[in-house]
Amino acid sequence: AEKKTVTVKQTGSPIXXXK
């Protein structure tokens, strides 16, 4: 789960969509 968070940050947190 922690590794997934790092991947999202590298792509620019597209899942969040917020940023």
From Swiss-Prot:
Gene name of the record: rpmD
A GO CC annotation given for this chain: ribosome
Origin: domain of life: Bacteria
Assembly and interaction partners: Part of the 50S ribosomal subunit.
Keywords: Ribonucleoprotein, Ribosomal protein
UniProt family annotation: Belongs to the universal ribosomal protein uL30 family.
Keyword set includes Ribonucleoprotein: yes
Keyword Cytoplasm: no
Source species of the chain: Brevundimonas vesicularis (Pseudomonas vesicularis)
Name of the protein described by the UniProt record: Large ribosomal subunit protein uL30
